[in-house]
Amino acid sequence: MTHPTELPLSPLSALQFYATAPYPCSYLDGRIARSQVATPSHLINSDIYTELVKAGFRRSGVFTYRPYCDGCRACVPVRVPVAAFAPSRTQRRMWKRHRALVATVSPLHYDEDHYALYMRYQSARHAGGGMDRDSRDQYEQFLLQSRINSRLVEFRDPDAPDGEPGKLRMVSMIDILGDGLSSVYTFFEPDDPHTSYGTYNILWQIEQAKSLGLPYVYLGYWIRESPKMAYKANFHPLEGLIDGRWKVLDPARVDLPPVDAALARAPLPGGHTGSV
């Protein structure tokens, strides 16, 4: 286990960091991945999680991690600087197309309609990946467990004239950080072709961050070699965490080492050091 250097003035000094055993990469076929995990999870509050996200960490339920792969640095943490964001013509069109959707923000909670939509989405978009067989308990552990400031956002069509709720189109989980919003996971109606709900959701988060006076929207990891991640490169400007520093990226020209480059890992937040 990794034992970080004790820093009495740092709220991160009580955390420990360890590397997982190797496992098959879910983004690049034939690759082997590892993660670095921050523990214990009950000590990771919103303030501490903000610092971890700035250092490239993400969460899945109460599991806080970042890529820690041997000889690979393909995963680039990315964020959108809200004040500088300039939507493209296509993004403006998507915003106009879906702006009638009614967004309702609430604490994390279970809803049968949400779970049914999640299963339809997984079956259509990720069939055979395992998540298309998630039980209710697995769904709740993945998306509805959090020890930080998290919200569930439901997007529906406007209510019908008779007062019936509009059709559920999309559900998004977000974390509210000290310096921005962090997009956790989004799923939407897979039977609506060419809707670009995912793009609209990020645009909505950018507007929400702007209204809250928060400077960033964190989008997780961008991988140049992964088609699943391509949409993140459509938001400009886009900042990436490379060699421990956030800098503006040009996804078409970003100077990243190749996937098999020598191991290079970003420093731990708060000046922590450690060994595996």
UniProtKB/Swiss-Prot annotation:
It holds the Pfam family ATE_C. NCBIfam families: PRK01305.1-1, PRK01305.1-3, PRK01305.2-3. The keyword Cytoplasm applies. Keywords: Acyltransferase, Cytoplasm, Transferase. GO terms for molecular function: arginyl-tRNA--protein transferase activity; leucyl-tRNA--protein transferase activity. The keyword Nucleotide-binding does not apply. Its main location: cytoplasm. Functions in the N-end rule pathway of protein degradation where it conjugates Leu from its aminoacyl-tRNA to the N-termini of proteins containing an N-terminal aspartate or glutamate. Its EC number is 2.3.2.29. It catalyses: N-terminal L-glutamyl-[protein] + L-leucyl-tRNA(Leu) = N-terminal L-leucyl-L-glutamyl-[protein] + tRNA(Leu) + H(+); N-terminal L-aspartyl-[protein] + L-leucyl-tRNA(Leu) = N-terminal L-leucyl-L-aspartyl-[protein] + tRNA(Leu) + H(+). It is found in: Cytoplasm. It comes from Burkholderia multivorans (strain ATCC 17616 / 249). This is Aspartate/glutamate leucyltransferase. One of its GO terms (biological process) is ubiquitin-dependent protein catabolic process via the N-end rule pathway. SUPFAM superfamilies: Acyl-CoA N-acyltransferases (Nat) (SSF55729). One of its GO terms (cellular component) is cytoplasm. It comes from the Bacteria. The gene is bpt. Belongs to the R-transferase family. Bpt subfamily.
